[in-house]
Amino acid sequence: MLPLVALVGRPNVGKSTIFNALTRTRDALVHDQPGVTRDRNYGVCRLDEDNHFLVVDTGGIAEEEEGLAGATTRQARAAAAEADLILFVVDARDGSSAMDDEILAWLRKLSRPTLLLINKIDGTDEDSVRSEFARYGFSEMLTVSAAHRQGLDDLLEEVVQRLPEEGSGEELDNDPNRIRIAFVGRPNVGKSTLVNRILGEERMIASDVPGTTRDSIAVDLERDGREYRLIDTAGLRRRSRVDEVVEKFSVVKTMQSIEQCQVAVLMLDATEGVTDQDATVLGAVLDAGRALVIAINKWDGLTEYQREQAETMLSLRLGFVPWAESVRISAKHGSGLRELFRAVHRAHESANKTFTTSEVNKALEVAYETNPPPTIRGHVSKLRYVHPAGANPPTFIVHGTRLKELQESYKRYLENFFRKRFKLIGTPVSFIFREGTNPYEGKKNVLTERQVKAKRRLMKHVKGK
């Protein structure tokens, strides 16, 4: 499982700003009013191909035990108890407070690895600030100004050193021959019912009450001579609808499962169409770059007219992922399961396909000759060569000149061309564009004294004419 880092501290110390800086997003609402982050935000910090970890932005811990503030406090404590590393955030401008002392007291009871992070260090005397917080007894204190991105590189370096290679949760699977499939979707869409139908026995608790599955549950399966690990995840729902502390933390488990799976099966309810919650789940799968199969559940309960309407709606709402196969199923009655597994196999094989440098360069050459990049302000981007850079998803690095000016429409053309040429079905395709460095960029051509004299003689000759 991905390691988990929790940001914990009293209200308005800058946890959400740090979260946005680490995850390179604006997902956490940032405001000067204390207590703006009432729920937990979850994101993935991707430093490079090998270093990923989950970040949890908790609401500020307040003194109240009742009402919204009390619920926020319980959420923060739940996040801290599950974390592989806690970043205890304090405010350099306000200094230490009685509430900081109380938070530190229960953090020590948790016995989780904890790092003191002093935020808003800009405009303060850093030595004085460090002296004030020295009484907390941390062997090392990190100072940052998240709003100005000051000290973040040192923070990331320290976090990576302190995190385990794998999170404290159960490892999903390391068997390369076993396909890891995560069934994801909003609550009560039929994920547990589908897994139970595949297994042929009721291993998951399935009911009509949304949110019955509170954690991600993994079950091994052998079917038609192939091995699988099926992961039934808790449903991802709108934050305003997530009320219980236990259920809130299940979102972390779901995101970890998506990051660790090889193929994500997104389940939709044919009777309700594609909702905003479905789009949120789909976004999490796309952010992780996982192979995708869309399972349209409860298809058997639709009339012919309703099916036509549903097909039109699906083509409109899912038009931005035309590469993902969609399968019509009934989790309750088991129809469509064989085609679902075939789609999973195609997506898995495409996502993990290997390529030679020669074949991808031939593809780039044909794509370039068939449809060269358009001229932008009198200049044309040139694609020199390409090489494969990884799988799940298939990734290609394209080298050339003026690639920063390459239009998004042309990048989509390359993606579609490679997808069609190599028959890549059910998987995202990633392109990374790199320009060669110009050794003379930013340098001014300084003339020698002899060149200056020659230039003067030439100018006199021109003027004389």
Swiss-Prot record:
InterPro entries: G_ENGA, GTP-bd, GTPase_Der, KH_dom-like, KH_dom-like_a/b, P-loop_NTPase, Small_GTP-bd. GO terms for biological process: ribosome biogenesis. Residues 3-167, 179-352 form the EngA-type G domain. Residues 353-437 form the KH-like domain. GTP 2 binds at residues 185-192, 232-236, 297-300. Keywords: GTP-binding, Nucleotide-binding, Repeat, Ribosome biogenesis. One of its GO terms (molecular function) is GTP binding. GTP 1 binds at residues 9-16, 57-61, 119-122. It comes from the Bacteria. Pfam families: KH_dom-like, MMR_HSR1. Belongs to the TRAFAC class TrmE-Era-EngA-EngB-Septin-like GTPase superfamily. EngA (Der) GTPase family. GTPase that plays an essential role in the late steps of ribosome biogenesis. Associates with the 50S ribosomal subunit. This is GTPase Der. It comes from Stenotrophomonas maltophilia (strain R551-3). The lineage of its organism: Bacteria, Pseudomonadati, Pseudomonadota, Gammaproteobacteria, Lysobacterales.
